[in-house]
Amino acid sequence: MTKFTTEEVRSKFITYFKANNHTHVPASSLIPHNDPSLMFVNSGMVQFKNVFTGQGKRPYNKAVTSQKSLRAGGKHNDLENVGYTARHHTFFEMLGNFSFGDYFKEQAIYYAWNLLTKEFELPKDKLYATIYHTDDEAAAYWKKIAGFGDDRIIKIKTNDNFWSMGDTGPCGPCSEIFYDHGEQIYGGLPGTKDEDGDRFIEIWNMVFMQYEQIDKDTSIELSQKSIDTGMGLERMTAVLQHVNNNYDIDLFQEIINFTENIVKVKAEGEAKFSYRVIADHLRASSFLIADGVIPSNEGRGYVLRRIMRRSMRHAHMLGSKEPLMYKLLPKLVDLMGNVYPELKRAESFISSILEQEEIRFKATLERGLKLLTEETETLTKGNKLSGEVAFKLYDTYGFPLDLTEDILKNRDIAVDHKGFEEQMLMQKELARKSWLGSGESKTNQLWFDIKEQHGSTEFLGYTLNEAKCKIIALIKNNNLVNDIKEIDTQFLLISNQTPFYGESGGQIGDIGTISAKDSEVEVIDTLKYLGSIIVHKCILKKGQINVGENANFSIDIRYRQNLRIHHSATHILHAVLHEVLGKHVTQKGSLVAPTYLRFDISHSKAVTNEEITLIEDKVNEIIRDNHEVTTTLMATEDAIKQGAMALFGEKYDSEVRVVKMGETSLELCGGTHVRRTGDIGCFKITSESAIAAGVRRIEAVCGEFVITLMRENDSLLKSIESSFKTNKNELITKVNNILERNKEVEKELEKTLLASLDLSIEQIEKQAAQITGIKLLYKKVGNIDNKILRQAAENLTKKVEDLIMVYIAEGIGKLSITVAVSKAITDKYNADIIAKKLSLFLGGSGGGGQASLAQAGGNDIGKLTNIHEKLYSLLTV
């Protein structure tokens, strides 16, 4: 049997099916674009799901893929086993061949058998097949093609061998191919009591989609039968490299060896599992970041954070004191970057996110581990860590629950999940204690009822600013009403069609007026419910408005034009950011208002002044070029093929609007836009800031608002010139002179304060209290800077060998604690411990420092009256 590399296995699989007239379809993002039921793509069929359900079509009827997949959240969560078992991974590659109404069972089995035995040269006597127990057709084909007897075809009665998407929809029996690693390895055939062993390993699964489930009791034959198959690349490579553990294949071993050379610890014994965790999690983290996921405390971002922090904890176990994962990234890019170019494109961004997250977590990891050690000292095998402690680790130290469980795994200590969930619920209740209910659930049902009765609202605003529309519903205080009579009453109005744009896609809703007969209504906002009901938020200004009557709907044209300007500028900005900052930039959020735009992007560091200038120049150049802005309706798949930018996780219909601005920008967008880029006028960035780890926010103004900004800045400059009694040419010089003078004054003040706090040896001897053979000197001072107190305390402890110096500075509603200990006595008295205990006594949360010098804070000023007693008790224990 020939030995293949991982790359060769992948390549041979794809080449084989291409030679058999399958279209090679590139891997989709790990983020499912059109499937809200999934957090991550977890198999090869996900990108074809709409084809299998009949909701979509492709220009081919046979496909082959190598699909990057991830299982670390929700139903498919393998995280706790990763690194400890032979075949569990968070990130893995799924090889698959697919037929959409072309070939079926016989050809699928033939393709699989031929590839395994002829191309990969697997011994035929090592292979077995499972089938669904009623699928005699598949059994017959296995006998015909592979020559299997009944002893090699295993009938399975459970749903493990019958696949379905849900309670209804396409479904069908499965046939799995198993490889026998040999009797030297424990395990039995599928269906036996020893089936969970590692001897017989599933290497290929074929799903024969031949039925449609109508309800729980009824299914019918599909007229168009399909094939969905999956072969785990890592598993297959292990078989072809004659190893029984996926982590022993070439790809993982190269990462592990590379890590070993950095960490300088052998990948043996318990350390072996940590190396495997790191290798697996490096792949998962890097590919998630490349696909636009950023570590956060919710959703996909939290799954990424859990994976990264689990890896960091294992790096810590190996003795790594510095960030490690970002140092391993170049090796991963070298191994997989040619197959997945997104890794190469986003390498610098991935590296910075990995390093930042490791630095951030390192600050709390050791403290959290210390707390966990203290809390489990008295626990023995089979005991449980309290939910309260687990929640404190999660809430205060950033330990995901599964990380705490992973740490305790080897000690056979569990975590009280119920107690943890109770603590989580308590926190959520506290967070919502000011929320008293608003009839929201009732209102949600109301929208569903309206949609069921009247359908979606037709939007006319792409071509019309004014239209005659029929009022189909009025809502006041969460209730449907027939009319509105009270002047200045706020209410919601729904019509069959409207020129008003409902807030969506970052663009806020239109304002304007609605008039009918003798009535007049002011529209103060326009919203969108259930994705397709446009709702006008109104105030009655005159007369009476009724359900069923026709009314004249008119948007505020100037307001809409300013929205158009800022929305089109957002598209141009997005394209320019790709060019200036890199292809890793993805949209994380946006707001298009009539007076400004806000755009949040994935980028790990501050945008420099030089980059901001370059971005502004390029955006304004595109505006001046006055490109035509065109809008086209096309199939989503065609739009993305043409290079249209789509947002990760955004759900798009089968037909989408594609907005094109010259050759600069091509995006899927349902918003309103200018006719030519020149209509924007001009563009100016007003601010750039961080809003989360790896996410930057850019705000900008366009058109007339740039002129307004310039006038405001000019007015401010004149006011500053007047205050400093100078002109703009000399302003910087004057300000710098003042700053220099301030520095000198601050230095003089610092010297004066230090001198006032200084004491001679004789004064120290006289003022200090004698406690257990050492001197304690406590001083309460005013709101003096910590830096000065630190220096003063250090100066005094250098003069006397047995002194503990404590300063407590009282500010507005807060206390600052400084503790210094002479180095000669730090073996007995630790400034860090004293400062932390004083902080807790004074209502703080602890501090930090070294044995000879530490600082902390507090806020319970009333307890200062008992500070002497507390100090004495701390030092006499």
Curated annotation (Swiss-Prot):
Task: List the catalysed reactions.
Answer: tRNA(Ala) + L-alanine + ATP = L-alanyl-tRNA(Ala) + AMP + diphosphate
Q: Does the record's keyword annotation contain tRNA-binding? A: yes
Fetch the Gene3D superfamilies from UniProt. Answer: 2.40.30.130, 3.10.310.40, 3.30.54.20, Bira Bifunctional Protein, Domain 2, Threonyl-trna Synthetase, Chain A, domain 2
Its Enzyme Commission number? 6.1.1.7
GO CC annotations, alphabetized = cytosol
Q: Which domain of life is it from?
A: Bacteria
Main location (coarse class): cytoplasm
Q: Where does Zn(2+) bind?
A: 567, 571, 669, 673
Q: Name one GO biological process term.
A: alanyl-tRNA aminoacylation
Q: How is the cofactor bound?
A: Binds 1 zinc ion per subunit.
InterPro entries linked to this entry: aa-tRNA-synth_II/BPL/LPL, Ala-tRNA-lgiase_IIc, Ala-tRNA-ligase_IIc_anticod-bd, Ala-tRNA-synth_IIc_core, Ala-tRNA-synth_IIc_N, Ala-tRNA_ligase, Ala_tRNA_ligase_euk/bac, DHHA1_dom
Q: What keyword terms does UniProt attach to this protein?
A: Aminoacyl-tRNA synthetase, ATP-binding, Cytoplasm, Ligase, Metal-binding, Nucleotide-binding, Protein biosynthesis, RNA-binding, tRNA-binding, Zinc
User: Any notes on this protein's domains?
Assistant: Consists of three domains; the N-terminal catalytic domain, the editing domain and the C-terminal C-Ala domain. The editing domain removes incorrectly charged amino acids, while the C-Ala domain, along with tRNA(Ala), serves as a bridge to cooperatively bring together the editing and aminoacylation centers thus stimulating deacylation of misacylated tRNAs.
Query: Which family, according to UniProt?
Result: Belongs to the class-II aminoacyl-tRNA synthetase family.
Which protein is depicted?
Answer: Alanine--tRNA ligase
Q: Which source organism?
A: Rickettsia rickettsii (strain Sheila Smith)
The upper taxonomy is: Bacteria, Pseudomonadati, Pseudomonadota, Alphaproteobacteria, Rickettsiales
